[in-house]
Design a protein with these regions (language model features):
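Repetitive helical segments and hydrophobic/amphipathic motifs
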Residues: 11-13
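Cyclophilin-like peptidyl-prolyl cis-trans isomerases
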Residues: 2-8, 17-239
Length: 239
Protein backbone atom coordinates (compact mmCIF):
# COMPACT_ATOMS: atom_id res chain seq x y z
CA UNK A 1 0.00 0.00 0.00
CA UNK A 2 1.30 3.38 -0.94
CA UNK A 3 1.95 6.03 1.65
CA UNK A 4 -0.61 8.79 1.42
CA UNK A 5 1.17 11.76 -0.15
CA UNK A 6 -0.05 15.14 -1.15
CA UNK A 7 2.88 17.42 -1.85
CA UNK A 8 2.62 19.19 -5.21
CA UNK A 9 3.79 22.76 -5.76
CA UNK A 10 3.90 23.18 -9.55
CA UNK A 11 3.69 21.00 -12.63
CA UNK A 12 7.47 20.76 -12.92
CA UNK A 13 7.98 20.00 -9.25
CA UNK A 14 5.10 17.53 -9.30
CA UNK A 15 6.73 15.51 -12.08
CA UNK A 16 10.00 15.40 -10.15
CA UNK A 17 8.30 14.39 -6.92
CA UNK A 18 6.25 11.63 -8.58
CA UNK A 19 9.49 10.08 -9.77
CA UNK A 20 11.00 10.40 -6.30
CA UNK A 21 7.93 8.88 -4.66
CA UNK A 22 8.17 5.84 -6.90
CA UNK A 23 11.61 5.18 -5.46
CA UNK A 24 11.05 6.08 -1.80
CA UNK A 25 7.59 6.80 -0.43
CA UNK A 26 8.75 7.15 3.17
CA UNK A 27 10.36 10.59 2.94
CA UNK A 28 8.34 13.06 0.88
CA UNK A 29 9.65 16.59 0.42
CA UNK A 30 7.94 19.33 2.41
CA UNK A 31 6.20 22.02 0.33
CA UNK A 32 7.47 25.56 0.12
CA UNK A 33 5.83 27.98 2.54
CA UNK A 34 2.62 29.32 1.00
CA UNK A 35 2.07 32.93 0.06
CA UNK A 36 -0.15 35.15 2.15
CA UNK A 37 -3.85 34.20 1.84
CA UNK A 38 -5.76 35.88 -0.96
CA UNK A 39 -9.39 36.94 -0.75
CA UNK A 40 -11.25 34.50 -3.02
CA UNK A 41 -14.74 33.15 -3.51
CA UNK A 42 -13.73 30.02 -1.58
CA UNK A 43 -13.81 31.95 1.67
CA UNK A 44 -17.48 32.73 0.99
CA UNK A 45 -18.54 29.08 1.13
CA UNK A 46 -19.74 28.40 4.64
CA UNK A 47 -19.60 24.97 6.30
CA UNK A 48 -22.89 23.10 6.23
CA UNK A 49 -24.03 19.84 7.74
CA UNK A 50 -22.95 17.95 10.87
CA UNK A 51 -19.92 18.77 13.02
CA UNK A 52 -17.11 16.39 13.92
CA UNK A 53 -15.49 16.61 17.34
CA UNK A 54 -12.05 15.00 17.64
CA UNK A 55 -10.87 14.63 21.21
CA UNK A 56 -7.11 14.08 21.07
CA UNK A 57 -4.43 13.58 23.69
CA UNK A 58 -3.45 17.22 23.09
CA UNK A 59 -6.84 18.88 23.01
CA UNK A 60 -10.11 19.08 21.14
CA UNK A 61 -10.48 19.74 17.40
CA UNK A 62 -13.92 20.77 16.15
CA UNK A 63 -14.76 21.03 12.45
CA UNK A 64 -18.01 21.48 10.56
CA UNK A 65 -18.44 19.55 7.32
CA UNK A 66 -19.02 20.84 3.80
CA UNK A 67 -21.78 18.31 3.24
CA UNK A 68 -23.21 19.96 0.13
CA UNK A 69 -19.83 20.23 -1.58
CA UNK A 70 -18.50 16.78 -0.61
CA UNK A 71 -21.47 14.53 0.26
CA UNK A 72 -19.77 11.19 -0.43
CA UNK A 73 -16.64 12.13 1.51
CA UNK A 74 -18.64 13.37 4.49
CA UNK A 75 -20.83 10.26 4.47
CA UNK A 76 -17.75 8.02 4.34
CA UNK A 77 -16.05 9.82 7.23
CA UNK A 78 -19.18 9.72 9.39
CA UNK A 79 -19.79 6.03 8.67
CA UNK A 80 -16.19 5.09 9.53
CA UNK A 81 -16.30 7.26 12.65
CA UNK A 82 -19.52 5.67 13.88
CA UNK A 83 -18.72 2.12 12.84
CA UNK A 84 -21.64 1.80 10.44
CA UNK A 85 -19.39 1.01 7.47
CA UNK A 86 -17.27 -2.13 7.27
CA UNK A 87 -13.53 -1.72 6.79
CA UNK A 88 -10.52 -4.03 6.69
CA UNK A 89 -7.78 -3.89 9.31
CA UNK A 90 -4.58 -3.46 7.26
CA UNK A 91 -2.50 -5.21 9.92
CA UNK A 92 -4.62 -8.35 10.28
CA UNK A 93 -6.65 -8.31 7.02
CA UNK A 94 -9.69 -8.90 9.23
CA UNK A 95 -13.01 -7.38 8.22
CA UNK A 96 -14.19 -4.98 10.92
CA UNK A 97 -17.95 -4.71 11.48
CA UNK A 98 -19.71 -2.24 13.80
CA UNK A 99 -16.32 -0.91 14.91
CA UNK A 100 -15.41 2.79 14.70
CA UNK A 101 -12.20 3.20 12.72
CA UNK A 102 -10.81 6.46 14.04
CA UNK A 103 -11.02 6.00 17.80
CA UNK A 104 -7.58 5.16 19.19
CA UNK A 105 -5.64 5.95 16.02
CA UNK A 106 -2.71 8.38 15.96
CA UNK A 107 -1.58 11.40 14.01
CA UNK A 108 1.26 9.71 12.16
CA UNK A 109 2.60 12.72 10.27
CA UNK A 110 2.87 16.32 11.49
CA UNK A 111 4.69 19.25 9.88
CA UNK A 112 4.84 22.80 11.29
CA UNK A 113 3.54 25.52 8.97
CA UNK A 114 1.74 22.85 6.96
CA UNK A 115 -0.61 20.22 8.43
CA UNK A 116 -1.25 17.23 10.68
CA UNK A 117 -2.29 13.89 9.17
CA UNK A 118 -4.16 10.96 10.70
CA UNK A 119 -6.86 8.40 10.05
CA UNK A 120 -4.59 5.46 9.21
CA UNK A 121 -5.81 2.31 11.02
CA UNK A 122 -2.24 0.98 10.80
CA UNK A 123 -0.74 4.15 12.26
CA UNK A 124 2.10 4.20 9.74
CA UNK A 125 0.81 6.23 6.81
CA UNK A 126 0.72 3.14 4.60
CA UNK A 127 -2.62 1.79 5.80
CA UNK A 128 -6.11 2.16 4.36
CA UNK A 129 -9.61 0.83 5.12
CA UNK A 130 -9.58 -1.69 2.29
CA UNK A 131 -11.43 0.44 -0.23
CA UNK A 132 -11.09 3.69 -2.16
CA UNK A 133 -13.51 6.23 -3.58
CA UNK A 134 -13.48 9.15 -5.98
CA UNK A 135 -12.54 12.77 -5.34
CA UNK A 136 -15.09 15.55 -4.87
CA UNK A 137 -13.76 18.93 -5.99
CA UNK A 138 -15.65 22.20 -5.84
CA UNK A 139 -14.03 24.95 -7.94
CA UNK A 140 -14.88 27.54 -5.27
CA UNK A 141 -13.61 25.55 -2.29
CA UNK A 142 -9.85 25.76 -1.93
CA UNK A 143 -7.00 25.69 0.58
CA UNK A 144 -6.98 29.47 0.90
CA UNK A 145 -7.54 29.61 4.68
CA UNK A 146 -6.15 27.65 7.65
CA UNK A 147 -8.12 24.82 9.21
CA UNK A 148 -9.18 22.91 6.12
CA UNK A 149 -10.14 19.28 6.81
CA UNK A 150 -9.31 17.24 3.71
CA UNK A 151 -8.64 13.74 2.45
CA UNK A 152 -5.11 12.44 2.01
CA UNK A 153 -4.51 10.36 -1.09
CA UNK A 154 -1.88 8.77 -3.30
CA UNK A 155 -3.37 10.03 -6.55
CA UNK A 156 -6.75 10.67 -8.17
CA UNK A 157 -9.59 8.54 -6.83
CA UNK A 158 -7.62 6.95 -3.97
CA UNK A 159 -9.45 8.36 -0.94
CA UNK A 160 -9.95 5.98 1.96
CA UNK A 161 -9.80 6.94 5.63
CA UNK A 162 -6.72 9.14 5.98
CA UNK A 163 -7.28 12.86 6.42
CA UNK A 164 -5.29 15.97 7.21
CA UNK A 165 -5.93 19.40 8.74
CA UNK A 166 -4.00 22.44 7.55
CA UNK A 167 -2.62 25.13 9.84
CA UNK A 168 -1.89 27.65 7.07
CA UNK A 169 -3.21 28.32 3.55
CA UNK A 170 -1.80 25.62 1.24
CA UNK A 171 -3.08 26.55 -2.20
CA UNK A 172 -0.67 24.25 -4.03
CA UNK A 173 -3.07 21.48 -2.91
CA UNK A 174 -6.09 23.04 -4.64
CA UNK A 175 -8.11 20.53 -6.67
CA UNK A 176 -5.77 17.72 -5.66
CA UNK A 177 -7.41 16.82 -2.33
CA UNK A 178 -11.06 16.78 -1.36
CA UNK A 179 -11.87 19.44 1.23
CA UNK A 180 -14.79 18.27 3.36
CA UNK A 181 -14.67 20.38 6.51
CA UNK A 182 -13.54 23.58 8.20
CA UNK A 183 -12.12 23.69 11.73
CA UNK A 184 -12.71 26.61 14.09
CA UNK A 185 -10.00 28.95 15.39
CA UNK A 186 -9.41 27.22 18.77
CA UNK A 187 -8.99 23.95 16.88
CA UNK A 188 -6.41 25.49 14.55
CA UNK A 189 -4.41 26.40 17.65
CA UNK A 190 -4.54 22.74 18.72
CA UNK A 191 -3.37 21.74 15.23
CA UNK A 192 -0.44 24.15 15.53
CA UNK A 193 0.51 22.65 18.90
CA UNK A 194 0.38 19.10 17.55
CA UNK A 195 2.42 20.07 14.49
CA UNK A 196 5.24 21.27 16.74
CA UNK A 197 5.82 18.16 18.82
CA UNK A 198 9.13 16.36 18.54
CA UNK A 199 9.24 14.28 15.34
CA UNK A 200 11.36 11.54 13.85
CA UNK A 201 12.85 11.57 10.35
CA UNK A 202 9.49 10.64 8.81
CA UNK A 203 7.66 13.48 10.59
CA UNK A 204 5.97 11.04 12.97
CA UNK A 205 5.59 12.30 16.56
CA UNK A 206 8.14 10.69 18.88
CA UNK A 207 5.45 10.53 21.56
CA UNK A 208 2.16 9.36 20.11
CA UNK A 209 -0.56 11.97 19.62
CA UNK A 210 -3.72 9.90 19.98
CA UNK A 211 -7.12 10.55 18.47
CA UNK A 212 -9.02 9.28 21.48
CA UNK A 213 -12.61 9.74 20.36
CA UNK A 214 -14.45 11.02 17.30
CA UNK A 215 -18.01 12.24 17.82
CA UNK A 216 -20.45 13.36 15.15
CA UNK A 217 -22.84 16.14 16.16
CA UNK A 218 -25.98 16.62 14.00
CA UNK A 219 -26.37 20.03 12.42
CA UNK A 220 -27.94 22.52 14.80
CA UNK A 221 -27.16 20.50 17.92
CA UNK A 222 -24.82 21.86 20.65
CA UNK A 223 -21.30 20.51 21.03
CA UNK A 224 -20.89 18.76 24.40
CA UNK A 225 -18.17 19.93 26.83
CA UNK A 226 -14.68 18.54 26.34
CA UNK A 227 -13.72 15.65 28.64
CA UNK A 228 -12.83 17.01 32.06
CA UNK A 229 -14.44 20.38 31.38
CA UNK A 230 -17.11 21.64 33.72
CA UNK A 231 -20.30 23.16 32.50
CA UNK A 232 -20.47 26.90 32.97
CA UNK A 233 -23.17 28.16 35.30
CA UNK A 234 -25.06 31.18 33.99
CA UNK A 235 -24.38 34.38 35.89
CA UNK A 236 -26.97 35.39 38.46
CA UNK A 237 -29.32 38.08 37.20
CA UNK A 238 -28.62 41.59 38.38
CA UNK A 239 -31.25 43.21 40.63
Amino acid sequence: MKLKLFLMTSIAVAVFEMAAIAQDTAKPVEPALPDAPQATAAAMIHPNGPTVVMDTSMGRITCQFFEKQAPKTVANFIALAQGTKDWTDPQTSKKMHNKPLYDGTVFHRVIPEFMIQGGDPAGTGAGDPGFTFEDEFDPNLNFDVPGRLAMANSGPGTNGSQFFITEVPTEHLNQHHTIFGQCDDPSINVVKTIARVQRDGNDKPVEAVVLKKVTIIPEGQPVPPAPGATAQTPAAPQP
